[in-house]
């Protein structure tokens, strides 16, 4: 194999690796966004539960809308 052919093979491997890595990162970003959204909803449900109880709402006024 000549140097030119070896260089072309090297560039093809680099290109293939870059494409696979890029698409994997995008899929991972989508999974992270979905997990983050689910966590945000769970936190919101917990805060609403706290705000429904007077004792907890009094302690966490900044979360329950009892601003200063």
From Swiss-Prot:
* Compartments reported by the entry: Secreted
Residues bearing PTM Cysteine amide: 64
Q: What is this protein called?
A: Alpha-conotoxin Lt1a
Region (Ser-Xaa-Pro motif, crucial for potent interaction with nAChR) residue spans: 52-54
Q: Does the keyword Disulfide bond apply?
A: yes
What main location does UniProt list? secreted
Q: What are its applications?
A: The fluorescent analog of LtIA (LtIA-F) is a highly selective molecule targeting alpha-3-beta-2/CHRNA3-CHRNB2 nAChR that could be used as a molecular probe for the study of the structure, function, and distribution of this receptor in live systems. It displays a ~4-fold decrease in potency towards alpha-3-beta-2/CHRNA3-CHRNB2 compared with native LtIA without a change in selectivity.
InterPro entries hit by this protein: Conotoxin_a-typ
Q: Name one GO molecular function term.
A: toxin activity
Q: Which organism is it from?
A: Conus litteratus (Lettered cone)
């Amino acid at each position: 194999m000549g140097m030119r052919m070896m260089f072309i093979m090297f560039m093809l491997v680099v290109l293939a690796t870059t494409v696979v890595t890029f698409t994997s990162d995008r899929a991972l970003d989508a999974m992270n966004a979905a997990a983050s959204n689910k966590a945000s909803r769970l936190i919101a449900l917990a805060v609403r539960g706290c705000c429904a109880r007077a004792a907890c709402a009094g302690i966490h006024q900044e979360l329950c809308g009892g601003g200063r």
